Design a protein with these regions (language model features):
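Scaffold/interface architecture of coatomer-like assemblies
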Residues: 12-299
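Bacterial N-terminal signal peptides
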Residues: 1-9
Length: 299
């Protein structure tokens, strides 16, 4: 009888522990100063997590050490032709800095999306792929399609810490997906989306007449919605560059942000209804925070 009672007691304690653990939730958070510099050394009291406007208790804060699964999406349409050399230079340093403990894949979207290098932690394969990045003068971009396909790939693999980095021009986009479809796919896969937008690139030979009767006004509107809302709603960053020569510095800055992220663990009361909105902010007004909820692992 005593053994039976002890077994029940242990079982009850185990169930309580599992229930408590199931109520813990995690966010990956970037904290920046006003000049965009990542901030280190923060503690639980510095963070505020809110679910549907209700503040939750922050339990633990530490450096994010979970491996990242990064997909770098590169514009190889005709509009990006003048930037390709700077993109290659920036990516060489970017992948070298981020490869430790992480995996990267290269995807191009000048024409239909194409996986240039499958997910790997091998620097030689990535360098080889970077060397094969070329612009196609007669191609429009398919950025929105590339984002959806990449997000769905992360969803199928149940990637625990997925990240998308987009390098894109403002050229024509021939995608079949709408902005809402893209944003839904990004949020469903819990993928932080970062954008480096190369502005003022021109290719006078690439015009709407090349691509039939597509409504390019709506196409560009859909693309711009994704570039504006994607980073903001997924805990990412957006950087607009007036010259492609700034690409290496922009990628280096993004690498610094990604390697300086926090893993913030907070408590959520037991509920059958998940919150519609999860937000993170800092108690210090001079700091800004962007974060995305981590995917829950299966029990």
């Amino acid at each position: 009888m005593a053994v039976g009672m002890m077994s029940l007691a242990v079982l009850g304690q185990t169930q309580s522990a599992l229930q408590a653990q199931s109520r813990e939730r995690t966010m990956f958070v970037s904290v920046l100063e006003s000049d965009g510099t990542p901030v280190q050394g923060l503690v639980t009291a510095d963070f505020v997590i809110e679910e549907d406007g209700v503040e939750r208790e922050v339990l633990r804060v530490g450096r994010a050490r979970a491996p990242m699964q990064l997909a770098v999406l590169v514009d190889t349409s005709g509009s990006a032709a003048l930037a390709i050399s700077d993109i290659r230079t920036g990516l060489e340093a970017f992948v070298s800095r981020l490869l430790e403990s992480n995996e990267l894949t290269l995807v191009t979207f000048g024409g239909p999306p194409r996986i240039l290098v499958e997910s790997t932690d091998q620097i030689d394969r990535l360098r080889g792929g970077i060397g094969r990045i070329f612009a196609y003068s007669d191609s429009a971009a398919y950025l929105l399609d590339a984002l959806v396909e990449t997000a769905l790939g992360f969803e199928r693999r149940e990637s625990p810490r997925p990240v998308i980095v987009v390098l894109t021009s403002e050229g024509l986009d021939y995608s079949n997906h709408s902005s809402e479809q893209v944003l839904e796919a990004l949020q469903a896969s819990h993928v932080a989306t970062h954008v480096i937008l190369l502005k003022n690139l021109t290719n006078t030979g690439l015009g709407p007449s090349r691509f039939g009767n597509l409504d390019f006004g709506d196409s560009l509107f859909q693309r711009d919605q994704v570039l504006e809302r994607g980073p903001r709603t997924t805990g990412g960053q957006r950087r607009d560059l007036l010259t492609s020569s700034a690409t290496p510095d922009a990628l280096d800055g993004l690498a610094g942000i990604l390697t300086s992220q926090y893993e913030v663990v907070y408590s959520r009361p037991a509920s059958l209804i998940p919150p519609e909105e999860i937000a993170v902010r800092m108690r210090r007004s001079d700091l800004t925070a962007q974060g995305i909820p981590a995917r829950r692992t299966r029990d």
